[in-house]
A protein has these predicted regions:
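Short Gly/Ser/Thr- and Asp/Glu-enriched loop/turn motifs at secondary-structure junctions
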Residues: 38-42
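Extracellular/lumenal/periplasmic "stalk" regions immediately C-terminal to a signal peptide or transmembrane helix
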Residues: 1-37
Length: 168
C-alpha cells in the first residue's frame, strides 16, 4: 500500500509540475480564450476556436499554429503522457461544402488539424496522441455558443505502473 501511495504522490507532483510548465509556455494566451486547469489527475488545456480557426473552418490560422507549437514543444519530452485532443462545436448547422458534413465531422477535423501540427512541430510519440470529435454534445455552457466552440487537450499520465502495483 505504501508503494502505491508513493507512486500516486509521484504522479500527482509530476502533473502539477507539468501544469506549471504548460502555463509558462503559453503565457500571453491565457485570458484570451485559453485556460489551463488540473482536475481529476489530468491537465485540461482549453482553447476557444477564436484562437485557432476561422468560423466554420478546420484550417488553423497563424496565431493558432503558434499556440499549438508552443504547447507541443512544452510536452514533447513527456514519455509517460497520453494526449487526447477533443474538438467541440456549438449547435449551429454547418454550411454545406468544404468536405464537412456536420458538427461532428467538423469537430473531428479540427482535432485532427491540431494533432497534425503537434506531430509536425515536435517529437511527440504518435502512439500517445488521439484526435476525437465530440460535436455539439458536450457543451461548457448551453447558453454561450462561443464557449462551446473549442479544442480541449487533455493530458493524462500513463497509469500502467499503478495498475501493475495494484495487481501484484
Amino acid at each position: 500500500l505504501a508503494e502505491l501511495q508513493a507512486e500516486l504522490a509521484s504522479k500527482d507532483k509530476a502533473m502539477r509540475d507539468l501544469k506549471d510548465r504548460v502555463s509558462a509556455a503559453l503565457t500571453g494566451f491565457e485570458g484570451k480564450g485559453l485556460t489551463v486547469e488540473q482536475r481529476n489527475g489530468r491537465i485540461y488545456v482549453s482553447m476557444e476556436n477564436k484562437l485557432l480557426f476561422p468560423s466554420g473552418s478546420y484550417a488553423v490560422d497563424a496565431k493558432g499554429r503558434e499556440l499549438i507549437v508552443k504547447l507541443a514543444k512544452a510536452i514533447e519530452n513527456e514519455k509517460e503522457l497520453n494526449v487526447l485532443v477533443e474538438g467541440h462545436t456549438d449547435t449551429d448547422k454547418v454550411h454545406p461544402g468544404g468536405g464537412v458534413k456536420d458538427n461532428w465531422d467538423l469537430s473531428v477535423m479540427r482535432a485532427t488539424s491540431v494533432v497534425r501540427i503537434m506531430q509536425e512541430s515536435s517529437r511527440m510519440d504518435p502512439l500517445r496522441v488521439t484526435a476525437a470529435g465530440r460535436g455539439e454534445f458536450v457543451p461548457v455552457d448551453p447558453a454561450d455558443k462561443a464557449k462551446n466552440r473549442r479544442i480541449e487537450i487533455i493530458l493524462s499520465p500513463d497509469l500502467q505502473e499503478l495498475y501493475k502495483l495494484v495487481r501484484d
